């Protein structure tokens, strides 16, 4: 977790008075509104470092013999555990939803003033708007937390703690994934930031940078400039990059000012907390892995609009930890007419949430430069209740339009991504939540829901109600195929 000061402003971190915990655990950071900076102090030592376990045990003791422990008693402790486990959520604002369907407008261009009498076209004064609906998604976590029995057994307390910790961990990962990569081509997923930016790219207003090289400060500056051109220079923002990438960026700084408090040793492996006064969040879920399956292809002269050419295909898995390196590409497919299609098959990846399908047109496939994104598809099939019924293992390209700026991440060059996310409430990436099954506003974004009540137990479920909203795609930027060396 990095510094949370954003351009010297009292961010939502201060507004919500949340304390940010450093993953290194030996330093505790908190935002000080009066000083407009982040203060660091040694973390208080506790006998048991599992704070959730301590709190659950305390709640059990408080319940007393002969009394029941209600799930609602643990809700504040679970919320603290969620934000401690999932730092990204502390930066993303949650807006109160008022209905199950939300309407919004996405701006693709911005009206600009022009002088009267100029001969140039005034088309820059017009704006294009796309109206869409965001259906609020309901996610049920893991899927049930065990019944809250009478507080008499230590073994029950240990089992309860383990289940609660696992449920919090799972919901945290799911929310991180949903904010960045989720794609609503799958009925049971929300729309993540990657989908917003890639849809924007098809409209030729893209903030996707295909770097294809070692990270430089110029790249970060270009991302900042692209966002600032959209007039978001004063907004709260956040860098997302891997730990190794953050360390590499730190070595590119030619001058660093370090304030050492009395008794604080100098740290040899110095990592910059911010770049351009924007905090850097070290996130391992933007570090790709080699989990994507190989793809086989079969060409047909009918069923599509593919023209006469040679074609190659590859797919990459998107799982709960983000986009992975692309798998082994298909052999060369040949289409001789103008109505061709290509059917793809692969062995399903049980951990996949989505597949990203890439296509190359040409006689040979040399590098990932040749592959371009043509489609994002669901990785699973479901029944009417949302239960997984199978894995998706096929796709047919009938002539989809490729996004020229989006190439797959290649393991041979150890590609990675860097995100610049606008977190300003109602303008940047925002979570919409707080609607129950009946469409009524509720006080929390996620909560423990009582399923049934029996003589000695209160079965509960962790549920979250949210959708993602990004009104202005150009308020964010992503750099793809960035390397440490």
Predicted segments with their positions:
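Structured segments of extracytoplasmic/periplasmic soluble domains
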Residues: 170-178, 223-226, 230
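Short amphipathic alpha-helical coiled-coil/interface segments
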Residues: 163-171
